[in-house]
A protein has these predicted regions:
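Short alpha-helix boundary/capping segments
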Residues: 74, 165-172, 221-232
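Glycine-rich phosphate/pyrophosphate-binding loops
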Residues: 89, 93, 97, 186-194, ...
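A mid-to-C-terminal "edge-of-domain" accessory segment
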Residues: 1-167, 203-206
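Positively charged, aromatic-enriched nucleic acid-contacting surfaces
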Residues: 153-157, 199-222
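Mixed-charge, glycine-accented linear interaction segment located at domain edges/termini
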Residues: 219-221, 225-250
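Small-residue-enriched alpha-helical segments and adjacent helix-cap loops
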Residues: 152, 160-185, 189-198
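Terminal-proximal interaction/regulatory segments of ATP-powered molecular machines
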Residues: 170-174, 181, 209-219, 234-236
């Protein structure tokens, strides 16, 4: 296309069939959700032939890329488009229950900036709004003791300018940490969802944890990222709690 435009001094219309810049682009939330589901279905080996909603042919057959030319993120985008981008381009496996909240968060940034967001901008929003948030509560150190399936924890956190030592117990590591935070720092919430997976980063593997808490009927998500799965899950819980503090202050 660039060669054609250079040699002819003619511009290829953005909606020109097969080759236009926007021919395969999906901005609409409902279109993105349908395409994301179709691509996921195809990735699982369920389709012998190309059969993805709103895409008559495979864009890669004509030199297009899914991330750059199909899923485009702006204020109209849906939960499926944002999650598909983070999963396909950056290796995150966004829980189904988190996708709507995340989609609205990213759309809000696009709306405020009045522009389409690039992949690295979406990642930056995800990291800044959800991952390893440490204000006002930051994890310093912890240790667990286990008796069968019952855990007790000694936890040190930074709560604003104060270093606080917490103690708690529960039916799992995360449950014991949650109880320590609620009992010692006075938070009131229900621990509602937890998911984890590994993400390859070069030759290393990171543990990614997703935690949701419910406060007054509203679910709030946080994400933790660490080489250690226990640290990752604790950071995810603290991210959710810190996000609840941020929302309460708005």
């Amino acid at each position: 296309i660039k060669l054609y435009e250079k040699l002819t001094q003619m511009k290829v219309p953005p909606r020109q069939p097969y080759v236009g810049e926007l021919v395969y682009a999906a901005f609409s939330g409902s279109h993105q959700d349908a395409i994301a589901k179709g691509m996921a279905y195809r990735a699982n080996g369920n389709d012998k032939y190309w059969n993805v909603p709103y895409l008559a042919i495979d864009p890669q057959d004509v030199g297009k890329e899914y991330m750059a030319d199909v899923i485009r993120i702006n204020s109209q985008s849906g939960k499926g488009g944002v999650s598909y981008l983070l999963e396909s381009a950056f290796g995150y496996e966004i829980p189904i229950g988190m996708r709507e909240e995340l989609g609205y968060t990213v759309k809000g940034f696009s709306d405020n900036l009045h522009k389409e967001l690039q992949n690295d901008e979406v990642l930056a929003i995800f990291r800044n709004e959800y991952i390893n948030l440490d204000n006002p509560i930051k994890l310093n150190e912890y240790s667990f003791n286990r008796d069968n399936n019952y855990y007790s924890v000694l936890l040190e956190v930074q709560n604003g300018d104060t270093t606080v030592k917490l103690k708690g117990s529960g039916n799992g590591m995360l449950d014991s940490v949650s109880n320590a935070i609620k009992n010692c720092l006075g938070y009131h919430y229900i621990l509602t969802d937890y998911k984890e997976h590994a993400k390859e980063v070069g030759s290393n593997s990171l543990a990614i944890s997703y935690v949701s808490i419910t406060i007054n009927g509203k679910k709030i998500w946080g994400v933790g990222e660490d080489e250690d799965i226990a640290s990752s899950s604790i950071k995810a819980l603290l991210s959710a709690i810190n996000r609840s503090n941020k929302e309460a202050s708005v």
